[in-house]
Structures are given as structure tokens and as C-alpha cells.
UniProtKB/Swiss-Prot annotation:
It comes from Mus musculus (Mouse). Regulated by guanine nucleotide exchange factors (GEFs) which promote the exchange of bound GDP for free GTP. Regulated by GTPase activating proteins (GAPs) which increase the GTP hydrolysis activity. Inhibited by GDP dissociation inhibitors (GDIs) which prevent Rab-GDP dissociation. GO terms for cellular component: cytoplasm; cytoplasmic vesicle; mitochondrion; phagocytic vesicle; phagocytic vesicle membrane; recycling endosome; recycling endosome membrane; synaptic vesicle. It catalyses: GTP + H2O = GDP + phosphate + H(+). The modification Cysteine methyl ester is found at residue 215. Abundantly expressed in brain, heart and testis. Also detected in kidney and pancreatic islets. It is found in: Recycling endosome membrane; Cytoplasmic vesicle, Secretory vesicle, Synaptic vesicle membrane; Cytoplasmic vesicle, Phagosome membrane; Cytoplasmic vesicle. It is a lipid-anchor. Belongs to the small GTPase superfamily. Rab family. Its cofactor is Mg(2+). This is Ras-related protein Rab-11B. Interacts with KCNMA1. Interacts with RAB11FIP1, RAB11FIP2, RAB11FIP3 and RAB11FIP4. May interact with TBC1D14. Interacts with ATP6V1E1. Interacts with PI4KB. Interacts (GDP-bound form) with ZFYVE27. Interacts (GDP-bound form) with KIF5A in a ZFYVE27-dependent manner. Interacts with RELCH. Interacts (in GTP-bound form) with TBC1D8B (via domain Rab-GAP TBC). Forms a complex containing RAB11B, ASAP1, Rabin8/RAB3IP, RAP11FIP3 and ARF4. Interacts with WDR44.
Length: 218
């Protein structure tokens, strides 16, 4: 029998990218398990966790993938990005080099991910305000220039972690919903599973959303 965690209307794959040590793993654990590990070690390979939220009465299940930031693990790039509909591009507000590398990560994302992927720039470790090396206005301007949403977070004290994930998931949901509406208006309704992809309008049956709607293929 299925568990309550199996009951969802949409499944969205969201990836965490950015330099090693910026706090990607702790953002993941804070959002999915409300945990923070001061002694967390660098991720080796790939891991993911899930959490469901409600948006407009729909259950959105987020499958959030975390990967190592080190170059020696970048061979997994293609599989990591496959099917992702959202990305959190994370830097450390107290380490300017991690912000400088955002441009390289953004290029990698553009090269390997779907062209319609929703991207949020995340300045993590906002609790280290006394060590700030990246001005908020500078990062916000970069995000606007590159059509990214922007937020500063602290996985340590939980500041804006919920908001970051919920905002990007809601934005993805809005895009998917608009595509469903447009597709419904443009095509005759036909039976079949609803497989949602933000780059390809889904087929809908006009009935109750299929439990296994999803936005990613593993």
C-alpha cells in the first residue's frame, strides 16, 4: 500500500548547484528534515531528498538533488540535470569567490539543463553578516540581469529557507499550470496520463489530475 508521501499531483525535480562548501547540503536537510549539521562533510556524488508542499490546493512533491561542487565529480553533469525543472544556484555571502563562480555555474546550467528551467540565485549563510563579502544589491542586480529570482538564506538559523524552496516550486507550478491551460484551449481533450514538462505542453484529459503527474525522468 502507498503512503501519504506517495500522494501528490505534481513531481518537480529541483537541483542544487554551486561551489563546494556554500551550504547546499544543509539547505537540503533544513528544508526536507529541518536539520542542520555543523560538521557536514562535502557531498560525494549525488544525493536527493523529497518534501511535499501545498500550492493552490495541489500537492507538489519536490525531489531535490544535491551534488558535490568539486570538479572531479562533474562527470555526472548530464544525468544530474536531466529532467530538472528548477535550480537553486547557491553561493556563500562571506566568500566572494563562490559568488564570482556563479557565472560559470550558470553557463553549465544553460549548457546542460532544459532552456526553460526556473533558476533562483541564493546567497546562503546570511547569518555571517559581519563577514559579508558580497553586497546584497550587487547579487540582486546580477540576478535581474540574468532573469533569475534572488533570495538570501541561512540554513543555520533557517532564515528564508522555506521561502526559497516554496517560491521556486510555486513559480514552476504557475508555469506548468499556464501551459496546461494553453494546451487545453488549443487541443481537443484526449484521454491519457498527464506527464508535465515545462518545455513541452502536456496532454490532459480534463479530469482530476493523475496522481503521477511529473516533471522529470530519472
Amino acid at each position: 500500500m502507498g503512503t501519504r508521501d506517495d500522494e501528490y499531483d505534481y513531481l518537480f525535480k529541483v537541483v542544487l548547484i554551486g561551489d563546494s562548501g556554500v551550504g547546499k547540503s544543509n539547505l537540503l536537510s533544513r528544508f526536507t528534515r529541518n536539520e542542520f549539521n555543523l560538521e557536514s562533510k562535502s557531498t560525494i556524488g549525488v544525493e536527493f531528498a523529497t518534501r511535499s508542499i501545498q500550492v493552490d490546493g495541489k500537492t507538489i512533491k519536490a525531489q531535490i538533488w544535491d551534488t558535490a561542487g568539486q570538479e572531479r565529480y562533474r562527470a555526472i553533469t548530464s544525468a544530474y540535470y536531466r529532467g530538472a525543472v528548477g535550480a537553486l544556484l547557491v553561493y556563500d555571502i562571506a566568500k566572494h569567490l563562490t559568488y564570482e563562480n556563479v557565472e560559470r555555474w550558470l553557463k553549465e546550467l544553460r549548457d546542460h539543463a532544459d532552456s526553460n528551467i526556473v533558476i533562483m540565485l541564493v546567497g546562503n549563510k546570511s547569518d555571517l553578516r559581519h563577514l559579508r563579502a558580497v553586497p546584497t544589491d550587487e547579487a540582486r542586480a546580477f540576478a535581474e540581469k540574468n532573469n533569475l529570482s534572488f533570495i538570501e538564506t541561512s540554513a543555520l538559523d533557517s532564515t528564508n529557507v522555506e521561502e526559497a524552496f516554496k517560491n521556486i516550486l510555486t513559480e514552476i507550478y504557475r508555469i506548468v499550470s499556464q501551459k496546461q491551460i494553453a494546451d487545453r484551449a488549443a487541443h481537443d481533450e484526449s484521454p491519457g496520463n498527464n506527464v508535465v514538462d515545462i518545455s513541452v505542453p502536456p496532454t490532459t484529459d480534463g479530469q482530476r489530475p493523475n496522481k503521477l503527474q511529473c516533471c522529470q525522468s530519472l
